[in-house]
């Protein structure tokens, strides 16, 4: 396999990547990619007199007997090179299914915890061009399968962004997305630095491993070009969706969201994307659903109703209205001092001295709020209010969306598709949507 040279440091990193004077967290597993990143970044920061900001963080998932020894090896290597190092362990029972996804979430949660403790504003990871190509191919294959079923959306084909925001607070930087894995290993060999190969990277039961084995240089170059195009399309679509929001086409009344349909013909694709994004927010879903042929037909026809991703979408001549489907709405007990996310829509903290129960309101409780006046007569919408979050404490029930938040409790709406990770190219859309969903009670 041929490799490309590693670009000059000023191409990989820029001063804007590391503004401020806080710590810079680098995720280092002990593999070749992350170790090469660590030493490349150390070189760059040394050239700017900022090497002391660098902190390597190793997450020990505890999934292999060798993991603790490997983490200790990274710590020793960092000590020899004057790099501050921390090891964090994934504690608790490991799931029997969906292990890779849960491990990934746990890894980023621990990295964010380290960043919080260190006062860092940025987390840097060593994803490479090979990783990017593999991600693109996997998503392309899934999207093609979905297209066959009339559900493809293509949104994920932009693959991994160089810059994103993680957990609403930390900048996630991937500076090596243009660099081949082989080039990084050559760099380490030239510096006489060894690395550890994870045996999971050769497990044929892994989708990524199977894709990796099929990729040659030409396929990787082709995937790289396709990602650039897909990213441009996604960024452009996000800007158009943000413009639609900023034109006052979206408003929230209680628990029902309204989108104006008139005059969107020239931006139909962006409007469809906005509807799907809002459906994910209303339904409390992390993934934005594809605009299927059935949904698109409904939006074009201007008359009908469909449920998508836990959200009811009602289309009329002049508007699209969305509210949460009355289904799978859990009751949650929140002890004093605890916090939780309810239904993927609300982040709630109980700072009071009494337990709080989170649930949907009973029919009689809703009527009491309106003094027995039907909600529709007040301009509000009964079906959507039946899915709102009611807070019950010491026998008293409060509906924050209508009555305000009781003392000792904090509550905020969540824009779930943007809550854990948002690409830099979609931050304009997030900025446009946040005022719409800001909690005004």
Regions found by a protein language model. Give the residues of each.
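Residue-level preference for alpha-helix termini and adjacent loops
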Residues: 62, 98, 135-140, 156-165, ...
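Bulky hydrophobic/aromatic packing residues
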Residues: 40-44, 87-93, 123-124, 170-172, ...
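Acidic, metal-coordinating catalytic cores used for nucleic-acid/nucleotide bond scission
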Residues: 63-68, 202-205, 303
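ATP-dependent adenylation/nucleotidyltransferase module used to activate substrates
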Residues: 2-150, 182, 328, 395
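Flexible helical/loop "lid" subdomain adjacent to adenine-nucleotide binding pockets
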Residues: 128, 133-290
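AMP-forming adenylation/ATP pyrophosphatase catalytic core
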Residues: 17-23, 29-30, 90, 164-169, ...
């Amino acid at each position: 396999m041929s490799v490309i040279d590693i670009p000059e440091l000023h191409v990989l990193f820029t001063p804007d990547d590391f503004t401020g004077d806080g710590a810079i967290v680098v995720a280092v597993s002990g593999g070749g990619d992350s170790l090469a990143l660590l030493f490349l970044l150390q070189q760059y920061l040394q050239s700017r007199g900022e090497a002391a900001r660098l902190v390597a963080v190793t997450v020990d998932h505890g999934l292999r007997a060798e993991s603790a020894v490997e983490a200790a090896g990274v710590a020793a290597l960092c000590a020899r090179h004057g790099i501050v190092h921390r090891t964090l362990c994934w504690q608790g029972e490991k799931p029997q299914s969906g292990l890779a996804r849960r491990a990934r979430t746990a890894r980023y949660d621990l990295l964010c915890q380290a960043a919080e403790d260190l006062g860092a504003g940025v987390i840097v990871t060593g994803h490479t061009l090979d990783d990017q190509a593999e991600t693109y191919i996997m998503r392309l294959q899934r999207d093609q399968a979905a297209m066959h079923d009339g559900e493809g959306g293509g949104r994920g084909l932009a693959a991994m962004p160089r810059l994103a925001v993680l957990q609403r607070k930390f900048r996630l930087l991937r500076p090596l997305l243009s660099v081949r894995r082989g080039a990084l290993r050559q760099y380490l060999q030239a510096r006489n630095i060894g690395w550890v190969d994870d045996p999971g990277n050769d497990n044929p039961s892994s989708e990524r491993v199977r894709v990796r084995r099929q990729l040659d240089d030409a396929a990787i170059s082709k995937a790289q070009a396709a990602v650039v195009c897909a990213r441009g399309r996604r960024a452009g679509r996000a800007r158009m969706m943000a413009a639609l929001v900023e034109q006052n086409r979206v408003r929230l009344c209680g628990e029902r969201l309204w989108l104006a349909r008139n005059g969107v013909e020239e931006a139909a694709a962006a409007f469809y994307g906005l509807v799907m994004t809002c459906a994910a927010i209303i339904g409390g879903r992390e993934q934005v659903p594809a605009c299927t042929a059935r949904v698109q037909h409904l939006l074009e026809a201007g008359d009908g109703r469909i449920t998508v991703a836990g959200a009811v979408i009602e289309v009329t001549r002049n508007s699209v209205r969305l509210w949460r489907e009355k289904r799978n709405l859990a009751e949650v007990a929140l002890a004093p001092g605890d916090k939780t996310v309810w239904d993927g829509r609300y982040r709630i903290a109980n700072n009071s001295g009494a337990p709080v129960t989170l649930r949907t309101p009973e029919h009689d409780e809703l009527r009491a709020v309106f003094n027995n006046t039907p909600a529709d007569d007040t301009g509000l919408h009964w079906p959507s209010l039946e899915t709102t979050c009611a807070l019950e404490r010491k026998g008293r029930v409060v509906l924050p969306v209508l009555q305000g938040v009781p003392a000792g409790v904090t509550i905020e709406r969540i824009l779930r598709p943007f809550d854990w990770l948002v690409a830099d190219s979609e931050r304009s859309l997030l900025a446009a949507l946040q005022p719409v969903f800001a909690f005004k009670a």
